[in-house]
């Protein structure tokens, strides 16, 4: 793990807090088994979306700010908010902030967690990591999933269109390098050797048989 943190430390100004280290470790565990680029991009997304804290965060703003998410507003309707106070109650939370009653209900149903009744549970690092991983690999947020894109710039569409796509791609490249420094990448198995069938040489006949017999006599002598 030392090589991993040595590689990413420049992203954090040369030093990391224990909370940042803990957040990275939570995300490394949550993304284990995913393709290398997907792991790197999820780490980069968390780095960007949490303002480099690597901890689940709550969307910033006083309660009046979230009135724009209330039922009856254009945004509120798109988020599935139906009850007064839903805008603030279901404001953004997590590594990649889920927002709105409909999204909390969807994530909670898929994870088996009562996020509607307890939206603060989306701030639990383990729950937040599961939302991030499954949301990005299954296409919860925009209908796009990581496997739809072969490059880091394109992967931004999984979360938020093309907003800061190039910048986050740069972060992902750093996280990819860190993962390669710390994780044994299994080499492709060597192909099975090609065994050519034996070619049967017909036994010599006539003069060929006589010459072969003479050659054998000389070898014995």
Annotated model-derived regions:
Residues 115-162:
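An amphipathic alpha-helical core segment
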Residues 2-26, 42-135:
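Peptidoglycan-targeting cell-wall enzymes and recognition modules
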Residues 31, 43, 79, 84-87, ...:
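Generic structural signal for short, flexible, solvent-exposed coil/loop and linker residues
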Residues 1-29, 34-38, 74, 109, ...:
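Extracellular cell-wall/glycan-interacting regions and their flexible linkers
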Residues 48-59, 142-143, 161-169:
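Secretory-pathway/luminal and periplasmic proteins that interact with or process carbohydrate-rich
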Residues 31, 46-49, 99-102, 135-139, ...:
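Generic structural signal for hydrophobic core residues of well-folded globular domains
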């Amino acid at each position: 793990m030392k090589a991993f943190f040595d590689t990413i430390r420049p992203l954090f100004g040369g030093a990391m807090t224990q909370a940042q280290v803990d957040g990275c470790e939570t995300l490394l565990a949550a993304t284990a088994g995913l393709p290398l680029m997907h792991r790197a991009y999820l780490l980069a997304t968390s780095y960007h979306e949490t303002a480099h804290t690597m901890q689940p965060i709550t969307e910033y703003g006083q309660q009046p700010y979230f009135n724009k998410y209330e039922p009856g507003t254009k945004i509120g309707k798109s988020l599935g908010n139906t009850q007064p106070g839903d805008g603030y109650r279901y404001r953004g939370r997590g590594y990649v902030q889920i927002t709105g009653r409909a999204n909390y209900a969807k994530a909670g149903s898929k994870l088996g967690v009562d996020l509607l009744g307890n939206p603060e549970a989306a701030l639990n690092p383990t729950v937040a990591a599961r939302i991030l991983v499954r949301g990005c690999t299954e296409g919860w947020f925009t209908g796009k999933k990581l496997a739809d894109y072969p490059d880091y710039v394109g992967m931004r569409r999984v979360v938020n269109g093309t907003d800061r796509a190039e910048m986050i791609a740069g972060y992902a490249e750093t996280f990819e390098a860190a993962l390669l420094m710390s994780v044994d990448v299994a080499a492709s198995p060597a192909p099975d050797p090609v065994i050519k069938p034996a070619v049967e040489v017909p036994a010599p006949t006539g003069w060929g048989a006589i010459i072969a017999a003479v050659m054998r006599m000389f070898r014995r002598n």
